[in-house]
A protein has these predicted regions:
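S-adenosylmethionine-dependent methyltransferases
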Residues: 1-286
């Protein structure tokens, strides 16, 4: 198992605590999703299936049309996506976690990374809750190696991977510098510990946006940070100060982090325009 700085028994105990306080839900187990040589050798989509977008200053990305993806997934009878669409919902706990949508704070995080010139070249990066993958793609284009993680396998296969392929000129880099995962965060900790056993395989940067909305999942999020971040690494969490209707928010998440006494926190960016939004930086306490 990966050496996290605490024993396997303690890691299991942490996850057991999470499960005991959550509403009982059937979370999808974590899996690693491989990109085949066939996917890399053929055209990933038709020209009408994607658009070019200016997302972060002068950074222009090609993105699959989400409407087309939804239609395709409905035709394939992907029941979780069908249920979400029938309810006109971006979120159905343990079934669909909004990965087909580019959320507002992802733009904030991307612009912050560029504007503050956060070093990305030769860094190992986790785009956690990646959805369309725009933050991870930005890191890739700046020389990082990136692991993309989102809850729904359908999102990774139908949106994240095609978006990565569309934006990387040398497709061999997709296999050399990328990995893709889906499933629940507690399960992801266990899976990644089985696949990557050395401290140097932890991440220099963990980037995550709009993932603190559900208080029941925040301990899982925190556990990923403390187990998978290098000792001199940084986490950047972009989110709203308060998520109406679901109860999470920046202050509430920051309180959890401070109670755990593992990370220092610093608000490195904020906006009062519209709904209040912030970017929180976490580093290990010394």
């Amino acid at each position: 198992m990966f050496k996290f700085g605490f024993s396997d028994d303690n890691a299991k105990e942490e996850n057991d605590k999470i499960e005991s306080i959550e509403t009982v839900l059937d979370w999808f187990p974590a899996v690693k999703i491989e990109v085949s040589h066939e996917q890399l050798s053929k055209k990933c989509c038709e020209d009408d299936d994607f658009k070019e977008c200016d997302l972060f200053y002068d950074v222009r990305l090609k993105l699959i049309h989400s409407d087309k993806v939804v239609i395709d997934l409905q035709q394939e009878n992907c029941e979780n996506i069908v249920e979400a669409e029938s309810q006109h919902s971006d979120l159905i706990p343990a079934k669909y976690e909004g990965g087909l949508k580019v959320w507002e704070c992802s733009y904030d995080l991307g612009k912050y990374l560029i504007g503050d010139k956060i070093p990305l070249e030769n860094k190992s990066v986790l785009d956690l809750g990646c959805g369309t993958g725009i933050i991870g793609i930005l890191a890739l284009l700046n020389g990082a190696s990136v692991h993309f993680q989102d809850y729904n396998t359908e999102v990774i296969k139908s949106v994240t991977i095609p978006n990565v392929i569309l934006n990387i000129n040398d497709r061999k880099h997709v296999q050399e510098r990328c990995a893709f995962f889906s499933g629940d965060w507690a399960s992801f900790i266990q899976l990644r510990g089985e696949l990557y056993r050395n401290d140097y395989e932890k991440y220099d940067l963990i980037l995550t946006s709009e993932t603190i909305y559900n208080p029941d999942n925040q301990k899982k999020l925190h556990n990923i940070f403390k187990t998978h971040l290098k000792k001199n690494g940084s986490v950047y969490v972009a989110g709203k100060v308060y998520y109406f209707g679901v109860g999470g928010g920046m202050r509430q998440f920051e309180d959890l982090v401070q109670k755990e006494k593992i990370f220092e926190t610093k608000t490195v960016w904020n906006s009062d325009e519209g709904v209040q939004r912030e970017i929180l930086k976490l580093t290990f306490r010394t």
